[in-house]
């Protein structure tokens, strides 16, 4: 009898929870329509995978790419709508969040064509790969709109778990297993530290979890200058630091870049930076509004260490992927300048603009590695010598992306850095901008060294790897070239017409 009553209560409670969830989705579903498109794409992928054979593999790419493009389209149609808070205050929709969601979707859309040849050469399970990519994208999108501490923790964990699985996707590769282990351990440690900071923030604000309510709670409890807030700031900075991977929280980055499959590295190198930057802007700018001087100082230290260590260590690298890992550490130092400046002096606008250019420059560079690596079996920088003689398009496209990463005029990277540094200078960050300028010059050296190898070879000799280099089959080659063309155009032409891009970025402030 008791069991029967308990069973009835369980059914009633489950029914109430389901009806509440259905009610929320019915009346608030339009606020997450782009995310719903991705969820539908995930379900469709699972259904087709369970009922199809290997001949339907092209459909998997088509469904994934189409769902991403449709999600981007839904975001564009929602542009300039009034900011809204939905799902009982857990999710916020505004232009500032949507621009980060757009960047994450753009990264994923460009990464899928890059992965076609690699998946076919290594015979990776295509469905699981695409499912993890779409789920990670979904987690990043929810993170951009997260408005409370619980969602801010769950969304990046969704992204991180998929990242761990993707980095260890080639289970037979010892380096991939090692990279996954380091990534998982450090990611778990950073998440626990982040939650520790959230607990201090929650307690100091009187039990509030929504970001704006936390600010009001700190005012009511007079705890905004308490030691607890300092502990929360330090813990959250460390937690976000592992996501952004600035120095000294960069230890996992080179190993994960070197050991993970190249398309996975290309995906993580941009999406993780965009998602973590969106998290940093919301966390530091709202709950820690009264501690702006403290978190400015912390981020300045991280930016200086990242720009110096990242660019100096990149010079000594012999692996192309490890070099790009340290290059990304230096690049995140430039992005942090925009976070410090904030919405005053167009800091966020310059950060968003530079991040858009960084996506195209970085993915364009990784397109070369995805093309060259599986066909030659090497990742050594010296083995790229003389690539221009066998594949001029790939070599020239890579050279343009590398020059743009270094900030050579008139490419997009130059104007992106120029505007970012100018905003930092106007905000009084003279020392930080000076370090950025000097380290940018250092980065040009190792980028030009690679370009010289690509064009002329080492001692004007072509390596055996390049000599045996063969172009890939038509379909996979076209998919990589498509992404490469988009990345090259985005790395060059937008630099000439910066004003419209800056204006759009300025229109996103919350």
Curated annotation (Swiss-Prot):
It catalyses: a plastoquinone + NADH + (n+1) H(+)(in) = a plastoquinol + NAD(+) + n H(+)(out); a plastoquinone + NADPH + (n+1) H(+)(in) = a plastoquinol + NADP(+) + n H(+)(out). GO terms for cellular component: chloroplast thylakoid membrane. It is a multi-pass membrane protein. Its main location: plastid. GO terms for molecular function: NADH dehydrogenase (ubiquinone) activity; quinone binding. It is found in: Plastid, Chloroplast thylakoid membrane. Its EC number is 7.1.1.-. The keyword Hydrolase does not apply. The chain crosses the membrane at residues 24-44, 59-79, 99-119, 124-144, 149-169, 183-203, 229-249, 295-315, 323-343, 347-367, 395-415, 418-438, 484-504. InterPro entries: NADH-Q_OxRdtase_suN/2 (IPR010096), ND/Mrp_TM (IPR001750), Ndh2_N (IPR045693). One of its GO terms (biological process) is ATP synthesis coupled electron transport. Keywords: Chloroplast, Membrane, NAD, NADP, Plastid, Plastoquinone, Quinone, Thylakoid, Translocase, Transmembrane, Transmembrane helix, Transport. NDH is composed of at least 16 different subunits, 5 of which are encoded in the nucleus. NCBIfam families: NDH_I_N (TIGR01770), PRK02504.1 (NF002701). HAMAP family: NDH1_NuoN_1. NDH shuttles electrons from NAD(P)H:plastoquinone, via FMN and iron-sulfur (Fe-S) centers, to quinones in the photosynthetic chain and possibly in a chloroplast respiratory chain. The immediate electron acceptor for the enzyme in this species is believed to be plastoquinone. Couples the redox reaction to proton translocation, and thus conserves the redox energy in a proton gradient. Belongs to the complex I subunit 2 family. PANTHER family: NADH DEHYDROGENASE. This is NAD(P)H-quinone oxidoreductase subunit 2 A, chloroplastic. It comes from Amborella trichopoda. The lineage of its organism: Eukaryota, Viridiplantae, Streptophyta, Embryophyta, Tracheophyta.
């Amino acid at each position: 009898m008791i069991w029967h009553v308990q069973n009835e209560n369980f059914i009633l409670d489950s029914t109430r929870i389901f009806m509440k969830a259905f009610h929320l989705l019915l009346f608030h579903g339009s606020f997450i329509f782009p995310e719903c498109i991705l969820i539908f794409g995930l379900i469709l992928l699972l259904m087709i995978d369970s009922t199809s054979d290997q001949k339907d593999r092209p459909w998997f790419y088509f469904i994934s790419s189409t769902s991403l493009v449709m999600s981007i389209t839904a975001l564009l149609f929602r542009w300039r709508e009034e900011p809204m808070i939905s799902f009982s205050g857990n999710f916020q929709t505004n232009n500032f969040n949507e621009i980060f969601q757009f960047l994450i979707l753009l990264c994923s859309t460009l990464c899928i064509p890059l992965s076609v040849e690699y998946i076919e050469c290594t015979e990776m399970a295509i469905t699981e790969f695409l499912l993890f990519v779409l789920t990670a994208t979904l987690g990043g999108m929810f993170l951009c709109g997260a408005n409370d501490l619980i969602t801010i923790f769950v969304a990046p964990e969704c992204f991180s778990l998929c990242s761990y699985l993707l980095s260890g996707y080639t289970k037979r590769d010892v380096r991939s297993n090692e990279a996954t282990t380091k990534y998982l351990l450090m990611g778990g440690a950073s998440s626990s530290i982040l939650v520790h900071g959230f607990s201090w923030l929650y307690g100091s604000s009187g039990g509030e979890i929504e970001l704006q309510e936390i600010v009001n709670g700190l005012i009511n409890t007079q705890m905004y200058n308490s030691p607890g807030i300092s502990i929360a700031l330090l813990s959250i900075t460390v937690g976000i630091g592992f996501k952004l991977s600035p120095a000294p929280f960069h230890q996992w980055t080179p190993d994960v870049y070197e050991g993970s499959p190249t398309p996975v590295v290309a995906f993580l190198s941009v999406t993780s930076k965009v998602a973590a930057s969106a998290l940093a802007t919301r966390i530091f700018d709202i709950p820690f509004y009264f501690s702006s001087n403290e978190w400015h100082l912390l981020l300045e230290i991280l930016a200086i260490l990242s720009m110096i260590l990242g660019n100096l260590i990149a010079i000594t690298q012999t692996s192309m992927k490890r070099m790009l890992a340290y290059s990304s550490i230096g690049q995140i130092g430039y992005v942090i300048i925009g976070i410090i400046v904030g919405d005053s002096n167009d800091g966020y606008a310059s950060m968003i603009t530079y991040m858009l250019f960084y996506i195209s420059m970085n993915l364009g560079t990784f397109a070369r590695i995805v093309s060259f690596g599986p066909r030659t079996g090497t990742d050594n920088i010296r083995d790229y010598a003389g690539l221009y003689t066998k594949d001029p398009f790939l070599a020239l496209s890579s050279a343009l992306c590398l020059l743009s990463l270094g900030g050579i005029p008139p490419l997009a990277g130059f104007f992106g850095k120029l505007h970012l540094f100018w905003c930092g200078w106007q905000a009084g960050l003279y020392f930080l901008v000076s370090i950025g300028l000097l380290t940018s010059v250092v980065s040009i050296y190792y980028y030009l060294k690679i370009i010289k190898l690509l064009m002329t070879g080492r001692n004007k000799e072509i390596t055996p790897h390049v000599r045996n280099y063969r172009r890939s089959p038509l379909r996979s080659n076209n998919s990589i070239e498509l992404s490469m063309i988009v990345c090259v155009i985005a790395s060059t032409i937008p630099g000439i017409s910066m004003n419209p891009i800056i204006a759009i970025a300025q229109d996103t402030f919350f």
